[in-house]
Amino acid sequence: MAQKRFLLNEQDIPTQWYNIQADMPTKPLPPLNPATREPMKAEDLAEIFSMECSRQELDCEHAWIDIPEEVLDMYKYYRSTPLVRAYALEKALDTPAHIYFKNESVNPLGSHKVNSAIPQCYYCKKEGVTNVTTETGAGQWGAALSYAAKVFGLEAAVYQVKISMQQKPYRSLIMRTFGAMVEGSPSMSTRAGKDIVTRDPTHPGSLGTAISEAIELARTTPNCKYTLGSVLNHVALHQTIIGLEAEKQMEMAGEYPDKVIACFGGGSNFGGITFPFMRHNILEGKQTEFIAAEPNSCPKLTRGKFEYDFGDEAGYTPLLPMYTLGHDFKPANIHAGGLRYHGAGVIVSQLLKDGYMCGMDIPQLESFEAGILFSRTEGIIPAPESCNAIAAAVREAKKAKETGKQDVILFCLSGHGLIDMTAYDTYINGDLRNYTLSDEDIERNLGTLPQV
């Protein structure tokens, strides 16, 4: 019988993260101080982030960053995660393509997010921090951060996007189980939240609003740092453990991917699975395709603009060079809450601009159709976010059937959907719908970009 699952021995788990910035021909533009418009140094970023994460954020010299022993010890509780050949999905699609998925749903709390939550909390603890704050959409990051904070003895406060909190009530319960304070965003507990609610009392919340509130709380709480679940360079760095493992596992399978796919919100799991493979395109001229699957209701990669913008709605973050829909963009109430973000990470934005990858926009109904197919063939109910990656993989597998090519397709299953069943209920009952943005809506939002 052909092998289906590929696992690494504990001694083969990577001991370094891969920093693609060091190998990029065109380095990412620096973050700017929003007041002075001057490039920021690590010391400036460390006002809200841990010092070590701030250094990693701006490091364009070192391609390999050692994983601290304490972090590696925590990783070994659940890593490596399986690389799985999706034979049943291939059969259902009647495709010559070979489809593999990296199963991050088996991680603690059910997603890839813990891969960065652990090192971020470790660095905070090492630097004497006692409190951490963060934002979360669907709750995967908030749950992971709450868990990691408890492991390292930190107090955690989480602002969860209000509409996602309503759609997925058990995620906030998970966070509270680990001792975190959880509040829906926009809230009335911060100045940023009050301003947003005053302007729009029915605002459903966005990752941009939640980030504003989490940063404000971090700035006003003694001995507190802000942690982020995506977008920033150091988060993608930590997530490269995914792709580095997958490289070794694909070698065990005797194949190399022609296409690598992940869903896209801010870029953490996309960068995690793709960057280790992308370095071979950059350094060796390989021709692997890298596809970021984003919801077509939040199309920053496919319809956004490459400009400096804030990472949050209130304008508390540094100005970041990114593909953006505008920091005050109010996304539709889609169920892939982790993808409802206006901008793309700095590294991914530069790589897209330079042609190393592409975006693919996926309608919500198509994503759930693919998620149901995957559930019924592979026996795993995927997170709504991951459904976008599956939908993109299905498109590519169908394309392989048309051309007769035996493409090797690898995608990241970033999380399971067992706490997202209300979304599946809505889809199965026929009540789910697609959302689209008009060109006028996008242009109106882009009209509010800061002048740099």
Give short role names for the model-derived ranges.
Residues C124-I163, Y256-N269, F290, E385, ...:
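A short, small-residue-rich loop immediately preceding and capping a beta-strand
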Residues A2-V129:
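Positively charged, low-complexity intrinsically disordered leader regions
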Residues N103-V114, V132-G142, L232-V235, I261-G266, ...:
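Active-site nucleophile and cofactor-binding loops and adjacent substrate-binding regions
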Residues W64-D66, I196-H234, I242, R279-Q287, ...:
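Active-site/ligand-binding loops adjacent to catalytic centers
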Residues W141-P204, K300-E313, M421-N429:
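Active-site-proximal loop->helix
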Residues V114-I118, T134-F152, Q166-P169, F264-T274, ...:
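Short glycine/serine/threonine-rich phosphate/pyrophosphate-binding segments
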